[in-house]
A protein has these predicted regions:
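Active-site-proximal specificity loops/subdomain of glycosyltransferases
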Residues: 45-99
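GT-A fold catalytic core of metal-dependent nucleotide-sugar glycosyltransferases
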Residues: 85, 89-135
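Catalytic core and acceptor-binding pocket of nucleotide-sugar-dependent glycosyltransferases
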Residues: 153-247
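Long, low-complexity C-terminal extensions of enzymes
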Residues: 223-321
């Protein structure tokens, strides 16, 4: 099993906390592979984790240049990799994997709370985390998917992705090309492609009771705007059964706030009345054109009301323009 995290050294304030939690809670003897974008970042990451023997750090461009790298033959995949750095989570983990290897791709802002092992996939399907909303953006790329009849999964969170290497490179290259221009300043394109792969490969969502994603709901945005502290925001989360917490978006910066890690541990220690099945998967839910049109209408309505100006966020329709 190849456990892979793509990151830059600039993310160390929160990533160090999360990666150390992974190294501490992972029960197996698997190595953790960190991929980064420059020799300077590689050196900083090596120094940051020098005390953890199971962590290996690589400069991903060096691996990409290997003549045996099959992805070099696909112009769409090459174009994807040259886009936003986050998009490399779709390509670069395969650089450290052999055909048939289990691959687990983890965001550097996923914090692990309990001892665990990753359950093997064992087939050609895909596992992803679940979130109530979705981050399928920009609208232009989602529109292109519907125009080309490329099925999309709803509720996709990209904190963790697990599959057996390699991905279907020919199909991925075709899908990237079919989606047309991909705005390189929009990290969320990655989520659109994982969503496409989910419907192509099958599989399901990891149990969200165990694998929790921070939800940047409208209510939470308003709480933050009204001055809620990191401690108050974290107190809203239910970690009573959680194995991992994807602290996406602004939540990642709370992890290195004074006392935050201890608070998360305390919340995880709360007694739970239930015991979840750690192997349970929920089937992928299709994202429909009808729901997409409703989301676009809601966005226009909220924009007209001044909601996005109030909370200080960009209207979804403006992302990628």
């Amino acid at each position: 099993m190849k456990i892979v995290i793509s990151l830059g050294a600039s993310s160390l304030p929160y990533a160090s906390i999360c990666i150390r939690s992974l190294a501490d809670k992972l029960q197996g003897d698997q190595q953790i592979h960190l991929l980064t974008d420059s020799p300077e970042d590689r050196l900083q990451l090596q120094e940051a984790f020098a005390d953890i023997a199971r962590i290996n750090v690589y400069w991903s461009d060096e691996l990409w240049a290997n003549p045996g790298n099959a992805m070099q033959r696909f112009p769409g995949i090459v174009r994807l990799r040259e886009g936003h750095p986050c998009w490399r989570k779709l390509t670069d983990p395969m650089l450290v994997a052999s055909d048939g290897d289990e691959v687990v791709v983890i965001d550097p802002d996923v914090y692990f709370l309990r001892p665990f092992d990753f359950e093997p996939v064992g087939d050609t399907s895909l596992r992803l985390m679940w979130q109530r909303a979705n981050c399928l953006l920009p609208y232009s790329v989602v529109d292109a998917a519907f125009t080309r009849d490329i099925a999309l999964a709803d509720h996709v969170d990209i904190g963790i992705a697990q599959y057996r290497a390699p991905l279907d490179l020919e199909w991925l290259d075709w899908a990237i090309t079919a989606l047309g221009e991909l705005p390189t300043n929009v990290l969320h394109v990655e989520a659109v492609l994982w969503s496409c792969l989910a419907m192509r490969m099958g599989g399901g969502y990891l149990d969200p009771t165990l694998w929790r994603c921070w939800e940047n709901s409208q209510t939470k945005r308003i709480r933050r705007k009204l001055g809620a502290t990191p401690a108050q925001m974290l107190a809203l989360e239910d970690f009573s059964q959680a194995i991992a917490f994807h602290a996406g978006g602004v939540a990642k910066y709370w992890l290195d706030a004074p006392g935050s890690e201890d608070q998360v541990k305390d919340l995880a220690a709360r007694p739970s009345a239930e015991s979840a099945d750690r192997t349970a998967l929920q089937p992928f839910v299709p994202f429909t054109a009808k729901k997409f049109e409703w989301l676009k209408k809601r966005s226009r309505w909220l924009d007209a009301l001044g909601y996005y100006r109030f909370v200080g966020s960009t209207p979804p329709a403006s992302i990628g323009r």
